[in-house]
Amino acid sequence: MAELDRIDLKILRALADDGRLSWRDLAQKVGLSLTPTLRRVRRLEEEHYIQGYFARLDEERLSGAMSVFVSVSLEKQTGDYLARFEERIVDAPQVMSCFQMTGDADYMLRVVVKDLAAYQAFLTNTLTCIPGVAGIKSAFALKSVMLRSAPPL
């Protein structure tokens, strides 16, 4: 993998801000002609610095946007328990992100549901049905202050 230089970082920042930039506009933003810009983008894609292009959807308009942060503890932290949980949780469309954690909980989820009834249905029909789940703690977000689409570059 090649080291990222100043131009690569400019490309990544520009695409993180607007993944729909035309190649010509991107080239102009980073100060290169079209061909070298495209070559760099392809390399960044091949080396998995760019993992895809996504539309940021309005969660509130589409699903009601109740965000719930859910700490999940498992009965055991052995490989089979962890694998079983991860295999099942990735299939739940309400789960926007899932992180394995250190500390009191084994996993932290961000769940998006329409309302409290939808969250209760998620708990009873999905989360508590996963074998090995021993404890669940929920915290409801009051508002979203900010959401970044890329790490600091």
Swiss-Prot record:
Transmembrane portions of the chain: none
Official protein name in the record: Bkd operon transcriptional regulator
Domain of life: Bacteria
BP-aspect Gene Ontology terms: response to amino acid
DNA-binding region as annotated in the record: 23-42
Functional description taken from the UniProt entry: Positive regulator of the bkd operon for branched-chain keto acid dehydrogenase complex.
Domain annotation HTH asnC-type: ranges: 4-65
GO molecular function: sequence-specific DNA binding
GO cellular component term of the entry, any: cytosol
Organism: Pseudomonas aeruginosa (strain ATCC 15692 / DSM 22644 / CIP 104116 / JCM 14847 / LMG 12228 / 1C / PRS 101 / PAO1)
The keyword Transcription regulation is annotated on this UniProt entry: yes
UniProtKB keywords: Activator, DNA-binding, Transcription, Transcription regulation
